[in-house]
Swiss-Prot record:
Keyword Zinc-finger: no
GO MF assignments: RNA binding; rRNA binding; structural constituent of ribosome; transferase activity
GO CC terms, sorted: chloroplast; mitochondrial large ribosomal subunit
Gene3D superfamilies (alphabetical): 2.30.30.30, Nucleic acid-binding proteins, Ribosomal protein L2, domain 3
InterPro entries tied to this protein: NA-bd_OB-fold, Rib_uL2_dom2, Ribosomal_uL2, Ribosomal_uL2_bac/org-type, Ribosomal_uL2_C, Ribosomal_uL2_CS, Ribosomal_uL2_dom3, Ribosomal_uL2_RNA-bd_dom
Quaternary organization: Part of the 50S ribosomal subunit.
Family matches, as PROSITE patterns: RIBOSOMAL_L2 (PS00467)
Chain's gene name: rpl2
Region (Disordered): 219-267
Name the record gives this protein: Large ribosomal subunit protein uL2c
Organism, scientific name: Thalassiosira pseudonana
Subcellular localization: Plastid, Chloroplast
Superkingdom of source: Eukaryota
Length: 275
């Protein structure tokens, strides 16, 4: 992937850096693999805001992605590489030999016309999905299962990959993109390679409107709110927060407070917390 830089012709193009979309091969998705995407705009079933700063944005159709990769030992050919408005990674359309079509996350260096497989005892080619116990140490993998047969749940964002560090007993040790080191069952499947669009972190929208197109609403500082809206609010002019430490809008400690549950079951499988 490459980044397209814009000259300052207008205020909206100043500091703009967007994807060049050079790897995209088609602009129309497979009709059988899209469905209506009901956007709740950060509200729950009662209409109460549960996630702030969401709303608006362009309409999107959801692409059905195959995270399970459970068509074992049936080869598929990469037919196209497409843009997905619901994620920052690209997706690849597969045509299986039995006639079925599926979308997967597009790995780097997987091209149109390549053949991939999923199952046990297969080759270690880019895009192939196989159990962690069959992947050699030092390999980069993505779309990793946490529980066998549940489908990939971690390492799915653009440009990410995990590295296999060790194998011992029924578990494989992986280093995740967050530098967290954790154990995962050896029967869990993972896909060889790194997720595509690894320059996504370089993208700059250049203007507020482009961020609104993505469905993101403005984030307002607590110090400029009223005291009924935020613990930092109120006062005459620019006043200090008036507290011993920064707080969230709900009065909980912010900036450095660990929020992970202390009795979470998966904590036993985390050898080193993320940095």
């Amino acid at each position: 992937m490459s980044i397209r830089l814009y000259k300052s012709y207008t205020p909206g193009t100043r500091n703009r850096a967007l994807s060049a979309f050079s790897e995209i091969t088609t602009d129309k998705p497979e009709k059988s693999l899209v469905k209506k995407n009901h956007r709740n705009k950060g509200r729950n079933n009662r209409g109460v805001i549960t996630i702030r700063h969401r709303g608006g944005g362009h309409k999107k159709q959801y692409r059905l992605i195959d995270f399970k990769r459970n068509k074992y030992n049936i080869s598929a050919v990469v037919n196209s590489i497409e843009y997905d408005p619901n994620r920052n990674a690209r997706i690849a359309l597969l045509h299986f030999t039995d006639g079925e079509k599926r979308y997967i996350l597009h790995p780097n260096n997987l091209n149109v016309g390549d053949t991939i497989l999923s199952g046990k005892g297969i080759s270690l080619d880019i895009g192939n999905s196989l159990p962690l116990e069959e992947i050699p140490l030092g390999s980069s993998v993505h779309n990793i299962e946490l529980i066998p047969n549940r489908g990939g749940q971690i390492v799915r964002s653009a440009g990410t990959s995990a590295k296999i560090l060790a194998k011992e007993g029924n578990y494989v040790t992986l280093r995740l993109p967050s530098k967290e080191i954790r154990l995962i069952r050896k029967e869990c499947f993972a896909t060889i390679g790194e997720v595509s669009n690894n320059d996504a972190f370089l993208i700059q929208s250049g203007k507020a409107g482009r961020t609104r197109w993505l469905g993101k609403r403005p984030t307002v500082r607590g110090s400029v709110m009223n005291p009924c809206d935020h613990p930092h609010g109120g006062g005459e002019g620019r006043t200090p927060i008036g507290r011993t430490r920064p707080l969230t809008p709900w009065g909980k400690p912010a900036l450095g407070k660990k929020t992970r549950k202390t009795k979470k079951l998966s904590s036993a499988y985390i050898l080193r917390r993320r940095s």
